[in-house]
């Protein structure tokens, strides 16, 4: 991957074959590649066709170290996808408690829907 990026950094950093490289690396759990892409200027807020950002993917995977890396790189913590879901909501729906705790530590906004989810979690 590093060779591909060095060859044509401007267009490859964010896309390859219409796929978002950060999204692919996050889904595969390659934290080192995520860090490398961010260092090379990849956009931490890049969205796919459903409006899902890098944090949405990391939240679904429960990858806490990647979530923290993305937030520190400027990822918008309260971004909405086209279904109006935030990364925090996806972490809750996926049962990724460590990710939920991290989002709350970074002061992710808790909306009405999320309040209902959190009340259910607290009762269990």
From Swiss-Prot:
Gene3D superfamilies: Ankyrin repeat-containing domain
Domain of life of the native organism: Bacteria
SMART domains cross-referenced by the UniProt entry: ANK
Assigned keywords, A-Z: ANK repeat, Repeat
Signal peptide (UniProt feature, chain positions): none
Annotated ANK repeat ranges: 17-46, 50-79, 83-112
Protein known as: Putative ankyrin repeat protein RF_1087
Originating species: Rickettsia felis (strain ATCC VR-1525 / URRWXCal2)
